[in-house]
A protein has these predicted regions:
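Short beta-strand His + acidic residue motifs that chelate non-heme Fe in jelly-roll/DSBH
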Residues: 55-56, 74-75, 91, 95-102, ...
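A short glycine-rich, His/Asp/Glu-containing loop-to-beta-strand
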Residues: 17-55, 61, 108, 112, ...
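Extreme N-terminal tail/first-helix region
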Residues: 2-23
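Short acidic-glycine-tyrosine-enriched beta hairpin
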Residues: 78-94
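Glycine- and acidic-residue-biased ligand/ion/polar-headgroup-sensing regions
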Residues: 52, 60-72, 77
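Double-stranded beta-helix
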Residues: 2-6, 38-41, 100-128
């Protein structure tokens, strides 16, 4: 039962039932994505297997990384920060970020990171 005025029902989705694709940071399972926009979602969530990630940034979106497995290093504006299972990382818009090592993370983007909101330092071209 929905409370009157709500837009869509709650959602449960399992990683094994979610599409998987290659991203800038590694392989990701699309747990919640822009395809769910009609549900009124304000964010997306992906389970990502990071094996090193090229430094990049977003002008409009904030990201949260929660480390599920592994150990590595997250680079934020040139400063290296060790991360391990249980670490959480907040990445505001404009912060150049990347990673070293092999970690599995839950990445939440707020709002959804659009294709035209992925930039690489020194590049003048938008990348997807």
């Amino acid at each position: 039962m929905n409370i009157p005025g709500t837009t869509s029902p709650a959602l449960v989705r399992h990683e094994g039932d979610s599409p998987k694709e290659r991203s800038t940071c590694g392989w990701r399972h699309l747990l919640l994505s822009r395809q769910d926009k009609e549900r009124g979602l304000a964010a997306w969530a992906h389970a990502v297997d990071i094996d090193g990630a090229r430094e990049h940034y977003h002008k409009r979106s904030t990201e949260l990384y929660y480390v599920l497995e592994g150990e590595g290093t997250v680079i934020l504006d040139g400063v290296e920060h060790p991360v391990r299972k249980g670490s959480i990382v907040h990445i505001p818009p404009g912060v150049v970020h990347g990673a070293k090592g092999r970690v599995r993370v839950l990445v939440v983007g707020i709002p959804d990171i659009a294709d035209d909101d992925l930039f690489f330092p020194g590049d003048s071209v938008i990348c997807h």
